[in-house]
C-alpha cells in the first residue's frame, strides 16, 4: 500500500503517516497484522525517510483511539506503546506529531459510550445505499465520524502552527454532536 504513495510523491507534498491500529492486534485471528513496537518504529522511519527523499513533508499521526469504555463510562487508553513510539520517532527525526489517539479519546469521553456509536459504521438494513443489508462495524467510521477525526487533525495542524495551517480554510470548530442524533 505504501509504494504507490511513495512513487507518486512530489516536492512539497504533505504525507500524513498514521499506522498502528491494526499493527498492535495480537488476537489469533489477526496474527498476520501484528507488528512489534520495534518493527513499527522501523516502518515509521522508512516512511519518513522515503517521504523526505522526495522532498515531501512528513507529519506523524498517532493511531485513532479505539472506542472502549470502562464500567464507569470513562474512555480507555488503548494504544499506549504505539502512541509513545510515534512520539519517540517524531522527536528523533524532527517530525511533527498529531496526537489523534488522545484527542479522539477526549471526543469519545464528551460523547459517552452510547453517543460515540454515532461515529461508527453501525448501519441498519436499508439505511445506506452502499450497505443495503446494514453494517455493524465498531472499528471504522461512518462519514460523520471520519469528518470529526479530520476536524481534530485540522485543528491540531492549526494549534501547532504547522506551515500547512495557512492553507486550511476551516477548522477550529468546537466539538459538536451529530445533528441527526436527539
Tell where the protein language model's regions lie, with residue ranges.
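Alpha-helical cap/lid subdomain in secreted, periplasmic
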Residues: 1-147, 151-169, 177-181
